[in-house]
Amino acid sequence: MPSFDVVSEVDTHELTNAIDQANRELATRFDFKGVDAKFERDGDVINQFAPTEFQLKQMNDILRARLAARGIDVLSLEFGDIETNLAQARQKITVKQGIEQKIAKKIAAALKDAKLKVESQINGDKLRVQGKKRDDLQDAIAVLKAGKFELPLQFNNFRD
């Protein structure tokens, strides 16, 4: 029976490249000259530091542009609250990997509502979709691409 997996993953190598590019842009921008502002990556968390909250918001725009240029969807980021003190402001940005149970149920419900001849089952942080024909799977992919979910979806592990 043909099948494929629906996942939501971020390429960590591209994420590192995007953060490096954003740091290089910070070093060359005139409005950040002489300012201790930087991005740091720690696993699936990006920490950004700047002297003021306003500069953090400017850094968010820089990061979004660099991520988009590297092919990383900004929907996979979860921006935390801005913490400020006298010396600096900082913000944690969490990179979401995998599909949460709640969203996986929404995706499965969307496939059922489309009345396609496919079955879906939740396997941890991914969703397996099976159908009798490859055409049914292609229709399922079209339905999922048209749907609005809170995170970017990728389709992999195609089996015939």
Curated annotation (Swiss-Prot):
Record note on disruption phenotype: Disruption of the gene leads to reduced adhesion to monolayers of human bronchial epithelial cells compared to the wild-type. Mutant has reduced persistence in C57BL/6 mice compared to the wild-type strain.
Residues the entry annotates as binding 3',3'-c-di-GMP 1: 33
Name of the featured protein: Cyclic di-GMP-binding protein Smlt4090
HAMAP family: YajQ
Molecular function via GO: nucleotide binding
Organism: Stenotrophomonas maltophilia (strain K279a)
Database matches in InterPro entries: DUF520, UPF0234-like_C, UPF0234_N, YajQ-like_sf
Top-level division of the source organism's lineage: Bacteria
